[in-house]
Amino acid sequence: MTTLTPILTRNWDQADSFTRAAYEREGGYRALRRALGMPPDDIIQAVKDSGLRGRGGAGFPTGMKWGFIPQGDGKPHYLVVNADESEPGTCKDIPLMMANPHVLIEGIVISSFAIRANHAFIYVRGEVLHVIRRLQQAVAEAYEAGYLGRDILGSGFDLELVVHTGAGAYICGEETALLDSLEGYRGQPRLKPPFPAVAGLYGGPTVINNVESIASVPSIIDNGADWFAAMGTEKSQGYGIFSLSGHVTRPGQYEAPLGITLRELLDMAGGIRAGHRLKFWTPGGSSTPIFTDEHLDVPLDFESVGAAGSMLGTRALQIFDETTCVVRAVLRWSEFYAHESCGKCTPCREGTYWYKQMLKRLEAGKGEEKDLETLLDLSDNILGRSFCALGDGATSPVVSSIKLFRDEYLRHFEQGGCPFDPAASTLWGGATK
């Protein structure tokens, strides 16, 4: 039985967990003092040795990404933290920044020192004003204590940190669209190469990492790369925050080693809501192919989830019981992607629009089996042809739902409407059963 590993979340139950005093009480900023006494390249090597992979979805090795930054080039280097958490079901970074913003700030200072960056940015969703205020308060506290600014802790290292508010576009979670937005332009993905490590923010070498990725760095420096690498699986090392939402008794954030299964997490969360059973779930948010109860024992690591036909993504585990219409769920996700498409490329702009139109008609029972083949053909014209991964992600729930629940689509056509009571899947609907 895998057990939880509260590291990033260990002080969330403290009333003042978001303050500098509470963070220092738990050993906060100890790793920073150690890091400032190390050669920057040794920090990068430690992160490589730990096996830390990006926690924002792609799972790219963090230390390797840092190593791409050219040194001795005479250009200013930048660190950008992607806190534009916007995908349906993904809800780990916002509570982390609310409950423990100083672990992120400490990670930013260490990471910036490692890549020789003197300017860092936290790009936050514009809608989460409470998080923005919490971050700004924490940054001010860090400046007051000498953890930010000039000559940090007498090391001679300078770092300016800016909390930047986005305008609410999901596309700005794509790293190059985020850079465009940060520079004051409309957020749209850039052509790669050149990659941000060579020509990123303002044309300078830039590292872009997820909140949880950067927040994991202090524990690696404090406890050692071997400590981190000992957790998780052989190729997916360390711990992560798993977000359980939907039809589960105790939804929330569960921090555990990678490789834990949904069955184990559901046991910790009290199981599916009383009187119901699991129907389908997402392992990594709405942009990942859905799983069913047959996948309860798939280890939640990058390789195992990929081998089973989906992606670990952001570990946003959306749980749906048998009262949920899979067609309606896929329609809701498709409406989101159609609304959030930036419009730059034709496959995504037109494809997500037609997803929405077709699924709305099919959910109402106005379709036939050949329409499913049209949806799959449409998916083939989006997947791999869109300018960025947003288009690819939009195809995942559509294709996987047709593969796993074709009969449910056909029931809509046979009955001339949705066979599910929409109220039954709600919290109050479930309570009346």
Residue ranges: model-predicted function:
Residues 132-258, 270:
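Hydrophobic alpha-helical positions that pack around
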Residues 58-59, 64-66, 90-93, 132-137, ...:
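Short acidic, glycine/serine/threonine-rich loops at helix termini
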Residues 30-46, 75-77, 83, 90-97, ...:
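Ferredoxin-type iron-sulfur electron-transfer modules in oxidoreductases and energy-metabolism complexes
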Residues 1-44:
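Cofactor-/ligand-binding subdomain signature composed of acidic, glycine-rich
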Residues 49-69, 166-180, 184-186, 338-350, ...:
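Conserved phosphate/anionic-ligand binding catalytic regions in large, soluble enzymes, centered on
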Residues 107-111, 257-275:
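Short amphipathic, charge-patterned alpha-helical segments
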Residues 100-114:
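Histidine-anchored nucleotide/phosphate-binding helix
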Residues 23-29, 81-93, 196-201, 243-248:
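Gly-rich Lys/Arg/Thr-decorated short loops/hinges at beta-loop-alpha junctions or inter-strand turns
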